[in-house]
Amino acid sequence: LEIRNLEKSFGNKQVLFGVDLTAQQGHILGLVGKNGAGKTTIFHSILRFLDYSGEIRLGGKAITQETYKEIGYLPEERSLMPKLTIFEQVRYLAALKGMSTAEVKEKLPTWMEKLQVKGKLTDKIKSLSKGNQQKVQLIITLIHEPKLIILDEPFSGLDPVNTEVLKQVIFEEKERGATIIFSDHVMTNVEELCDDILMIRDGSVVLSGPVQEVRNSYGKTRLFVSNDFSKEELEALPHVTKVTMTKQGTWKLI
């Protein structure tokens, strides 16, 4: 996935400013930022839920209706139809990604076991706990084996046990060769799972690079394009022991 110079405005308010992003195949990219920083707007732009200026390409191609079938998306706001059964709900949305009923019947039990969903295929969505409903939503995201997986706050609301289950599934999808992007407020999740990190503040990218490089970058320089990025926020980054401003107006992290 490649994004170049992505910009977005709602009315007279600009919310994304020249965002560049690269997510490699078989890699996990962590998108970090406060609420309102622009993370979900980036996701919605990739999915073409919004008009935007800039360039977004998946596998070198623009996102089209056919390309969209190669994307799996877990929204921050989970939305399922309470009166449908688990099977009906998954079949309905998987069909939009090109899956047949027979394929859903074959794959759904395996996914329910993998994610430890407590329930039967014939159980109504409304009868499930919130945690199990979230797992069903995740099955819908992954069952068609998408090339690009977008997870908006995937660990929100999960207990520690189910968080570890989801982390294992994310690793397995990476091994399958999927490109994965997820947003999170918790740096420990990003450090544990991600190959690369992109930090966004007020619609602008303020930090990007390999997580391993950030973790081991004692004494190396990081450049930030946002001059109002606070020293306290930088000092909160993993393994940063000292933050100083250079004469050029960039931050040096040690």
Model-derived regions, located:
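The feature captures the beta-strand-to-loop junction immediately N-terminal to the Walker
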Residues: 32-34
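Conserved ABC transporter NBD signature motif
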Residues: 52-69
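Conserved ABC ATPase "signature" region
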Residues: 91, 95, 102-120
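Conserved ABC ATPase signature
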Residues: 124-131
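Catalytic Walker B motif of ABC-type/P-loop ATPase nucleotide-binding domains
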Residues: 149-153
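ABC transporter nucleotide-binding domain
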Residues: 168-252
